């Protein structure tokens, strides 16, 4: 696996190294040894799948509060998404900064989102599925989020947001 750093400390783009032959290819999307060697969360508690019917659907920006803060490892398994993470760690040099990465069924890249960062995505085509591993179990009382259009972050989404849940539209703006 190839690990590419991002401007946000602790966040990585992970590229599986495919071994191809006439049948197709094989690649690892997670390896405890390789993640531990970089000081990254070695274990995950849950794997989630999100399916979206329509291009432009926006989900997020989500995170869990302490003591249920979580690491996420996000991958698009079908279709294409623009995945965004925002650094919400007040002591971080990149506090309130964001990174966006296009994850597709073809590039097989994963985004490693560290604790203390919010994450969300927008679908770039119809019929898109994403899969993400989390280091903590879902804790409804700790579920939180910030608005996708918060001017404190200035996120530039690639498409107009055509479908957003009521819950995601009701997240508060982050204090400036």
Name these PLM-found stretches.
Residues 1-109, 127, 134-176:
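Non-catalytic, conserved peripheral segments adjacent to functional cores
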Residues 26, 121-122:
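Short catalytic/ligand-binding loop motif for oxyanion handling, primarily in non-cytosolic enzymes
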Residues 104-121:
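Conserved SET/PR-domain catalytic core that frames the SAM/AdoMet-binding pocket
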């Amino acid at each position: 696996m190839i690990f590419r750093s991002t401007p946000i400390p602790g966040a990585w783009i992970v590229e599986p190294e495919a071994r191809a032959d006439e049948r197709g290819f094989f690649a690892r999307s997670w390896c405890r040894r390789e993640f531990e060697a970089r000081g990254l969360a070695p274990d995950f508690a849950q794997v989630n799948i999100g399916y979206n019917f329509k291009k432009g659907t926006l989900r997020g920006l989500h995170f869990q509060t302490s003591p249920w803060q979580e690491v996420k490892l996000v991958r698009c398994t079908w279709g294409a998404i623009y995945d965004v993470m925002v650094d919400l760690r007040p002591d971080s040099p990149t506090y309130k900064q964001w990174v966006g990465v296009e994850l597709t069924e073809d590039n097989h890249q994963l985004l490693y989102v560290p604790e203390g960062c919010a994450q969300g995505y927008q679908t770039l085509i119809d019929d898109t599925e994403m899969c993400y591993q989390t280091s903590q179990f879902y804790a409804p009382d700790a579920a939180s989020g910030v608005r996708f259009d918060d001017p404190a972050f200035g996120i530039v989404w690639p498409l107009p947001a055509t479908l957003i849940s009521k819950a995601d539209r009701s997240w508060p703006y982050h204090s400036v």
